[in-house]
Amino acid sequence: SGMTPYKDNILKTPHIAIKVPTAGGKTFIACNAIHSIFSTYDSSRPKAVVWLVPWSNLLQQTANNLSDPTHPYRQKLNTLFNHSVEVYEKESLLQGTNFNPTSVSEQLNIFVFNFSSLRINSKKKDDRKIYQQNGALEAFRDTVVEQDLVLPDTDESALINIIRSLNPLVIVDESHNAESDLSVEMLQNLNPSFVLDLTATPKKNSNIVSYVNAIELKKEHMVKLPVIVYNHSRKEEVINSALHLQRQLEQLAIQESLEGGKKIRPIILFQAQSNIKGSDNTTYQKIKEKLIELKIPEEQIKIKVSGLDELKGIDLMDENCPVRYIITVNALKEGWDCPFAYILASLADKSSAVEVEQILGRVLRQPYVLKHKEPLLNLSFVLTASAKFNETLDNIVKGLQDAGFSNKDYYAEEIITEEIPVTDKEALNRELFGGTEEVTTHFDDADITNINVDAISFDPTANEVAPIANTAISQITQKAIEEGKAFETRLTEDA
């Protein structure tokens, strides 16, 4: 029949996956799915949902959005469950804050955890408070907890046993991060009645029941497609092109705003090279130093890496926010989201396909979910200077195809400087899936410390693109507009 056999990953528990590309609204889908699933259950049973996320910042984002009465997620839940919804994080559950046998039976209860709170070797359960005796939850001992569901070597009042007795629906966000043996044990320990996976990159053992195509997202103006990918010869050129392109996009956004459009402040994501074998090449701090050396105001530059989060507490969508440049390695894959991010300027040679997809996904979300008058504001851009361009493209393509995109959703080209001997045909027609001709180029493999700022023509006080950069920017933007029109034509033809 061509249908993939069901994989019984969690014994005797329905376990399905919804594959949704980045920016595809998977959280909103999950909110609707909760109601659909519970509508098939006995109405007298408690409605408990364990919502699992892989990272702490995504946990906070999820809990906040599900709790905020003005957010579409919470508004949908309130509509579906008659405003009887309570969202809990781990600490409020452990303390029994607004959490008791009566409330549990009368409302939709959503427990938001990150994997690390629950994913623990069965021999080390004493290391987690969720597995320990809890006096604040004594009221559940004789009213909710079922004796035959109590985990070995745990007290009946432990939070884990209360959750097990509620036989919850489990939602696993970014479920491709929950494939290890410990992750399977984590799910089994919850005694789920149903497991719903949400991911852009499902693993081979996933039971995919729904697939959202990227073209449908474009038709609804949810994503910035096509992705325009350009490879440069040197890292100075990447920085130069990114800065000038950002300025051009911002000028277009300002003009559109003056004509009644929404306010947009385009942002560049600079992807730094992670340290390799103790070397310190192309690190995030050095990129920031170079941008400041170019006289870019420091308040416009923020770093977001593991261990340093200068974006904490900043609302990037606030029209008074000055941030235009964000430097990262791969921390932005962890649930970070800002529709104003338009340009990914990668100063790293390569990364894994999944990492590329997750980082590239940060520039795909369309601001305000509407089509903008200026064509360039409906596209996203990736600028690189990689000697491994073909390998980098292979990773981008593989990652995005796995995430529901196709080879019609990109345009890729190399910008070749004059001193590099290639033909016009080679320089202008290196499309992502067109031809197999190799172009020999000589890339500068120096780290960011050796970048010559004098070779970067960007002036933050000027209003025009510098002549030196104008050719490259014109090439990028003109081709982007052409590809955008071609993409729109395909959408119309497919309608």
Kindly give the residue locations of the regions a language model identified.
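Conserved lysine of the Walker
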Residues: 26-27
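Conserved SF1/SF2 helicase motif Ia
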Residues: 19, 33-60
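Walker B catalytic acidic pair
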Residues: 173-174
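Helicase-associated low-complexity regulatory tails and linkers flanking the ATPase motor
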Residues: 39-40, 60-64, 70-90, 97-100, ...
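Conserved pre-motif I regulatory segment
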Residues: 1-19
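The conserved Walker
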Residues: 22
